[in-house]
């Protein structure tokens, strides 16, 4: 395990040096080492032990004349904990191990103490063979000894420290906000905590410190941050841990959107350049409006490394004889095209698989035109005139060997389907995993139409400041109002959402009224915020990048559990601690609670 930060060793009876920091400069020095038996090899006359500590591995040698040591070492199991004393010697030239930082030396030990002899292991630590996630999580303390996971946790610690240093240099103040707070009906489900002192009442674990950090702005702390634990009762995903996660929570007073962008871009550029081999594509990060990103990439979380872009061809089909496309040239609908260069001569299987994926995304089918060596082919060709084909070629810059895929229908639905196809075709390209292609998504709609409830709803954060403030709310159609909301995205992963906040009570009342809330409802739900804003609130805004996701990206991990020391499984269970678990009746009575479990369905037959 390589650790780029030199270790300060506490000298005592267990150790004077660290395994991974020994090298040829320590030749003939007497050392004390302690750690875990990584591997043991008996070569007849000699026993070799790879001793591992937090800094790396060092090879120990027990010579045959040391009969007592030899006998003791023969019964050692892997992962036993030992402390040794010995002398550093240089390895023979043909025995040097260039993969180890201590590979030029070995330690001939003179005495050994077995601090803890390990029982047979549930899985191998040294070989890192594939192991079921269930077993890994049950014995997480053992899993954490494995090199890659161990290094991920060390990296996470170093990254957190670097973030703190950077923000402190930018005059941010770290402030801890409450863990026990009130429940909010918005967002994900809360984790509830019953109150013993107030029977029938509950605290909630915070889904985010959102309201507290805004109140800190009102309190006169102009730059706040916190590595904040957040709790949401939601299902697991590869990039989301169930139960709890950590975010870099930030808020700033007297700022505009671009001021916050500059701070976060500077921080990300700093930690990437100093702590990672990865490189950022472009600084400042591109700013892309929500409308533009949906039109071009079909998602508000685009992976800009994919060399494909959706193009609008609605105007080309206004008078087309192909009625399926012509009827989707009216307002609110569109016709989109996705050109894949050099793939026009693929087999039928290629197109069948693409159509299957399009149907999985919600499309009725997938129209396409292949520009093969012998001419244009595909199910759409017979419906298009020569003029239509020429217009397409010119508009899309099509060449022989290309293929163009089409989607048509309602604007948002069509964009999303074509965005899904863009991601599907990403496998045709070799994307650089060391490239970090960040972007800001801006100008989100303030409202959206809820088809199910047949009403106007907030599309994102209801506490965002509308662009144009009160004038926009009073004079514009609700669905045309934009908000000062923004997302930061990297390689198709959303790291965070943020916003410039609505700090003016009358604008807040009006914004909620458009979404169907009365003043009384707003006061009932958010009265403490309204009251604070009436007593002098500065303009402010913030963001909260997910720390777990950022570490996941920088460590090249596909699963967020690989960067969390003690994660839950996908069923929100801690297999190591057997949580959640039942509690005693006495504990429930003390909290004035009674558990009523759902009735099990009786098996028929």
From Swiss-Prot:
Localization: Cytoplasm
E.C. number(s) listed in UniProt: 6.1.1.23
Site for Important for tRNA non-discrimination, residues: 43
Record has Transferase as a keyword: no
InterPro entries the UniProt entry points to: Aa-tRNA-synt_II (IPR004364), aa-tRNA-synth_II (IPR006195), aa-tRNA-synth_II/BPL/LPL (IPR045864), Asp-tRNA-ligase_1 (IPR004524), Asp-tRNA-ligase_1_N (IPR047089), Asp/Asn-tRNA-synth_IIb (IPR002312), AspRS_core (IPR047090), GAD-like_sf (IPR004115)
An example molecular function term from Gene Ontology annotations: aspartate-tRNA(Asn) ligase activity
One annotated Gene Ontology cellular component of this protein: cytoplasm
Coiled coil: none
Keywords annotated in UniProt: Aminoacyl-tRNA synthetase, ATP-binding, Cytoplasm, Ligase, Nucleotide-binding, Protein biosynthesis
Binding site for L-aspartate: 186, 232, 460, 501
Region (Aspartate): 210-213
Chemical reaction(s) catalysed: tRNA(Asx) + L-aspartate + ATP = L-aspartyl-tRNA(Asx) + AMP + diphosphate
Cited Pfam families: GAD (PF02938), tRNA-synt_2 (PF00152), tRNA_anti-codon (PF01336)
Binding site for ATP: 232-234, 494, 546-549
Oligomeric and partner information: Homodimer.
Protein task: Aspartyl-tRNA synthetase with relaxed tRNA specificity since it is able to aspartylate not only its cognate tRNA(Asp) but also tRNA(Asn). Reaction proceeds in two steps: L-aspartate is first activated by ATP to form Asp-AMP and then transferred to the acceptor end of tRNA(Asp/Asn).
PANTHER family, per database record: ASPARTATE--TRNA LIGASE, MITOCHONDRIAL (PTHR22594:SF5), ASPARTYL/LYSYL-TRNA SYNTHETASE (PTHR22594)
Family: Belongs to the class-II aminoacyl-tRNA synthetase family. Type 1 subfamily.
Name this protein carries in UniProt: Aspartate--tRNA(Asp/Asn) ligase
Lineage per the UniProt record: Bacteria, Pseudomonadati, Chlorobiota, Chlorobiia, Chlorobiales
